[in-house]
């Protein structure tokens, strides 16, 4: 199912609610997650996404990790893996993960692609 959202400034975007399908990215993909989500779902995600290069950054659980040290950890991983403007950062989890990944994607090389994959239960 696709839900179209219209913002106050008349900009729109789609939210896709579905099971993840097998997807290949002709670019580098970095997944940002935490130990809780990765413990339940990371292997499933690895089965569904393939890319030129696929790597994972695991940040600690908790609101206290919503800080610049966490952003630095994500950005260092991006630099070490030589992500470019066509690369993709995937927020794999909710709250803190989405906020940190979105911010990191917005400032890395003036902005790179960012996906959010929210997880609500065990597979």
Where do the protein language model's features map onto the residues?
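Glycine/threonine-rich beta-strand-loop-alpha-helix active-site module
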Residues: 66-123
């Amino acid at each position: 199912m696709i839900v179209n959202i219209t913002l106050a400034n008349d900009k729109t975007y789609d939210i896709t609610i579905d099971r993840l399908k097998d997807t290949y990215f002709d670019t580098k993909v970095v997944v940002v997650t935490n130990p809780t989500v990765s413990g339940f779902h990371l292997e499933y995600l690895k089965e569904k996404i393939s890319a030129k290069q696929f790597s994972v950054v695991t940040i600690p659980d908790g609101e206290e990790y919503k800080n610049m040290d966490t952003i630095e950890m994500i950005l260092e991983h991006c630099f070490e893996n030589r992500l470019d403007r066509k690369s993709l950062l995937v927020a794999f989890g909710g709250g803190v993960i989405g906020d940190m990944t979105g911010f990191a994607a917005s400032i890395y090389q003036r902005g790179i692609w960012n996906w959010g994959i929210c997880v609500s239960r065990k597979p």
